[in-house]
């Protein structure tokens, strides 16, 4: 299993790189043929590859993903084992979960069980969401092979909302006539503290400003600024509360 996990980890697969995601499913299928004795089907869902092994109408679904966060080349070496701890991009989330699920499929009735691996989970499952929801409604059980930080059984997870806020200002020369400009950077910075105030630690709701970009040159009043926001919560009520506040 470790050798198979190593092969997957050393095949880097950031969500944004379609060729890399296709390659990691190819590697996964090579491992599948060795472990199961047959290959999975690679289907296309809104232009993205999805690995599907087993029934198209399963009673039980083992749900995984093989895309990762980090851009190619972010880690060296890609694979390291120290004692009983393996490290590398995707080891924890969630290539090890895929390998465990694949080995669990040995000896199972593939007419009743399916193992699915998507390639857009780290960016919100925008293209695979419909597929996941449809197959989940039909199945008796869906087991998501996501690890937890302390090794306990994960029985739920937060929903995620992503926002991008854009401010349009007015450009002007920062030295000659700054008073004629409207500074988009200043205006968007006023929003940050208001966003942070929306979090609710007791209910587990987080609102995190992440990427902010603004300006064009060092001597120009910024005419445009944007801010990305990552919000997560356990309930739809909290997600709606945050959304309403942001849109207000």
Stretches found by the model and what they are:
Residues 1-91:
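Acidic/His- and Gly-rich active-site-bordering loop/insert found
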Residues 3, 10-17, 41-43, 147-148, ...:
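Metal-dependent amide/peptide-bond hydrolase catalytic core
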Residues 6, 29, 99-102, 106, ...:
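Predominant activation on well-ordered alpha-helical scaffold segments within soluble catalytic domains
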Residues 60-62, 143, 170:
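Residue-level marker for buried hydrophobic side chains located in beta-strands
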Residues 67-69, 120-122, 170, 234-236:
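Short coil/turn motifs at secondary-structure junctions
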């Amino acid at each position: 299993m470790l050798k198979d996990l190593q092969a997957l980890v050393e095949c880097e697969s950031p969500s944004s790189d379609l060729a890399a995601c296709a390659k990691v499913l190819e590697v996964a299928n090579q491992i599948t043929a060795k472990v199961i004795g047959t290959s999975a089907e690679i289907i296309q869902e809104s232009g993205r590859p999805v690995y599907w092994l087993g029934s198209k109408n399963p009673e039980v679904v083992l749900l995984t993903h093989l895309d990762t966060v980090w851009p190619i080349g972010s880690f060296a070496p890609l694979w390291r084992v120290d004692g009983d701890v393996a490290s590398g991009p995707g080891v924890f989330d969630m290539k090890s979960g895929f390998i465990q699920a694949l080995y669990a499929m040995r000896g199972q009735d593939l007419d009743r069980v399916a193992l699915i691996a998507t390639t857009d989970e780290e960016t919100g499952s925008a293209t695979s969401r419909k597929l996941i929801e449809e197959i989940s409604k039909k199945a008796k059980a869906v087991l998501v092979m996501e690890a937890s930080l302390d090794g306990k059984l994960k029985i739920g997870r937060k929903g995620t909302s992503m926002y991008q806020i854009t401010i349009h200002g007015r450009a002007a020369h920062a030295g000659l006539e700054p008073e004629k400009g409207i500074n988009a950077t200043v205006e968007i910075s006023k929003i940050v503290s208001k966003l942070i105030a929306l979090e609710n630690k007791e209910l587990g709701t987080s609102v995190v400003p992440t990427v902010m970009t603004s300006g064009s040159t060092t001597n120009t009043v910024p005419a445009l600024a944007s801010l990305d926001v990552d919000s997560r919560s356990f309930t739809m009520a909290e997600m709606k509360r945050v959304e309403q506040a942001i849109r207000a």
